[in-house]
Design a protein with these regions (language model features):
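Rossmann-like NAD(P) dinucleotide-binding subdomain of oxidoreductase/dehydrogenase enzymes
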Residues: 107-200
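N-terminal Rossmann-like NAD(P)+-binding subdomain of aldehyde/semialdehyde dehydrogenases
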Residues: 1-113
């Protein structure tokens, strides 16, 4: 199967990508899990550094991302720029506040001391829609990565370029290799990913 993004205004092809086979998808999940094993032990202040860098990349390239959204799914150019900038704000926000949000909470019980602690889950699958192709992903990815998780993304099939651009942002920002990956798969393959023993 080939994924092809079509400019909705002109009907012309923008790009095309081959669907990943299950063996490749499984390998990506395993690589993401390996990256997670180190990332989960990374202090919040160190997790925040690449997330803030991701925010800066989004700002610096907001016009490029706005153009990509316009080409793949028809979002007005200025709205795409605003969406990229909103994603940057989310990156900054979670980089600055995640440690406070995830601090252990003391609770009253009969025990000498009781508390709730928040621990990373592992590799988290995100299945995302096309209408806000950057925002829907970053509103998941920014807090998920700051919480110490890894992420794999199955984006809508009409915005493959956006999906790969987002993966590249996390790479360029300096996150560990394979911590966030895009899966080029169709909807029928999602259940197989959900059932993978390393996906949480």
């Amino acid at each position: 199967m080939t994924f092809q993004s079509i400019n909705p205004a002109s009907g012309t092809p923008v790009s095309s990508y081959e669907e990943m086979q299950r063996a490749e998808v499984s390998k990506i999940v395993e690589q993401a899990h390996s990256a997670f094993l180190g990332w989960r032990r990374t202090p919040f202040r160190d997790r925040a550094v690449p997330l803030k860098k991701a925010g800066q990349i989004l700002r610096d390239k907001s016009k490029e991302y706005g153009r990509l959204m316009a080409e793949e799914m028809g979002k007005p150019f200025k709205d795409g720029i605003a969406e990229a900038e909103k994603c940057a704000t989310a990156c900054d926000y979670f980089a600055e506040h995640a440690e406070k949000f995830l601090a252990s909470e003391d609770i009253a019980t009969d025990a000498k001391r009781s508390f709730v602690t928040f621990q990373p889950l592992g590799v988290v699958l995100a299945v995302m829609p096309w209408n806000f192709p950057f925002w829907q992903v970053f509103r998941f990815a920014a807090p998920a990565l700051m919480a110490g998780n890894a992420g794999v993304l199955k984006h809508a099939s009409n915005v493959p370029g956006c999906a790969l651009a987002i993966e590249q942002i996390f790479k360029d920002a300096g996150f560990p290799q394979n911590l966030f990956r895009t899966l080029m798969i169709g909807s029928k393959e999602v259940n197989a990913v959900i059932e993978h023993p390393l996906v949480r």
